[in-house]
Amino acid sequence: MEFAFSDEQDMIRTSAEGFLAEISDSAAVRAAMASDLGHDPAVWRRLSEEMVWPAIHIPEQYGGLGLGFVELAILLEQMGRRLFCSPFFASACLATPALLLAGNEQSQLLLLDPAFLDFVINLSEFK
């Protein structure tokens, strides 16, 4: 069995690699680790608004990108390479699948909506 990434997945990796190289250098990682929040809210907002990564595997019917766990793993791999500090794992890897599995249609429509994502981003700025 041979496994190869698709062109779209290669594009995601290249894009993530470039973006994270810009925002998660050694100084940024150290500053985030030393902060009370453990991440830089401005960077988290930028990642969420520009790259839309927290919505990577939210189904399109809820306003997400509708991609799968392979694409999510590509992002996590690149974040690990750069020691990127953010609430990404908690939101995209834990909360989203939990809502998709356990939530009812009404809660999914509310909590997976991109407008709600902005609320979550704002919450991440407070300790």
Labelled PLM ranges:
Residues 1-8:
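Intrinsic disorder at enzyme termini
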Residues 9, 20:
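Conserved S/T- and glycine-rich ATP-binding loop of Class I adenylate-forming
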Residues 21-126:
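Glycine-rich flavin
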